[in-house]
Amino acid sequence: MSSAVVSPVARLGPGVASRPGRRVSRAAKRHRLRASASVVVRQVAGEGDELVRKLKTCASVTAASFGPGRSDAVSVLDGLVRKIKYSGEAFVLLEAVEEDEEGGGDGACLGCADVTALPAFGPRASKEALVARVPMALGLTEQSNFAYLSGMCVDPGHRRRGVGVKLLEACESYARRMTPTPAVIALHVDGDNEAAIALYEGCGYVRVVEREVDDAFGRMSRAFGSLVGGGAKKILMHKWIKA
């Protein structure tokens, strides 16, 4: 979820990931948003042309959220198709939509997020460098599984309405229903995206480590539909969902 740059986030050194029960900072609590009752989050599903149409909508919203020069709808769409193809039932794409007058969720797409369940290690572990480092950063065991959240975005015209909160809550709910249940949800966020960091912290996510990441086209596309930047600093954040 993009925002104006206010000030850079201080570099964090590698550390041991905190366990459940860590207190959320007062600043994070002040940034917690009250979710709008008129927003519904649902899984993006379907077949054939119907599914393609829905994926294109999500791709367009994602591209608009990150802005010109950061992503484009075609690259985001390609990333989503790849995730569906290679991750199968371990992948879920969610969209936030506005309820219509009858209470149905058939309004405009306001935001998206996706979650992929991954083994911490082994032949089926992620091959994408950024994601592959998550298990070691969090101190996961060889038998552990984790959920990786990406593609989190809210349409610029619908921010500050609790859409992001509802998307995060839905991601956690779907992750808890995955088999085997992931021990933790992890995500990466740009170090200068203070609005997104505040949102995540307000929902219980904790920073782990910030590191330099090469955002060249192609490498990041495997993790998140081609974010084109230039040496952006990424902060790893996490939330334990299984004791």
State each model region's role:
Residues M1-A28:
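N-terminal chloroplast transit peptides
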